[in-house]
Regions:
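N-terminal single-pass transmembrane signal-anchor helix
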Residues: 1-37
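Generic detector of short, well-ordered, non-transmembrane alpha-helical segments enriched
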Residues: 21, 40, 116-119
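Membrane-proximal N-terminal amphipathic helix
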Residues: 26-64, 68-69
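Periplasmic/extracellular, small/polar-rich flexible segments of pilin-like filament-forming proteins
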Residues: 53-166
Length: 166
């Protein structure tokens, strides 16, 4: 009887350990997505500055309509490209636009209910070097940067990010 009880306890403990490992892996993967967002958007901004800011038109051609041509030119991180479209790690479409007479670029992403509020906060805190960052209905800038509390208040699973850079 002791042998059977010992085996049952060992099996239960083994299953609990597997559940714990799976949960930790899932949380790590979810946090990783927010880091990928920050890395990809930062790389995109760097590439856009190199490809557009020095031209006579500024960011005028930095638009969703020109994504296919910019893919050909290697503008985007490869994991953002799906055919002739751009997506974020949560599977949402990424759109591009010019603002302020072509002197600024605008990147919109997120908002498709694929992100968690925690990922939203991590992404908001990880994004840097922008003119403005709108998260949902809250706008941040270089004199009003997000922190854990303000990003937490702005974030949700449906919050859209709109980042404007120069």
């Amino acid at each position: 009887m002791d042998g059977i009880l010992g085996r049952i306890v060992a099996i239960v403990l083994g299953l609990l350990a597997l559940v714990g490992i799976a949960y930790a892996g899932y949380n790590g993967f979810q946090s990783h997505k927010a880091g990928v967002v920050a890395t990809n958007i930062t790389q995109l901004i760097t590439n856009a500055r190199a490809g557009f800011s020095q031209g006579n038109n500024g960011y005028t051609n930095f638009t969703t309509a020109n994504i296919a041509s910019m893919i050909t030119g290697g503008m985007f991180p490869s994991d953002m490209v799906r055919g002739t479209a751009l997506v974020d790690p949560w599977g949402n479409a990424v759109t591009l636009a010019a603002a302020n007479n072509g002197s600024q670029g605008v990147i919109t992403f997120g908002g498709g209910n694929g992100q968690t509020a925690k990922q939203c906060v991590s992404a908001a805190l990880g994004l840097k070097d922008y003119v403005t960052l709108a998260v949902g209905s809250t706008t941040f800038n270089q004199t009003n940067l997000p922190d854990q509390a303000t990003a937490g208040a702005a974030c949700s699973a449906t919050a859209t990010f709109t980042l404007t850079f120069q």
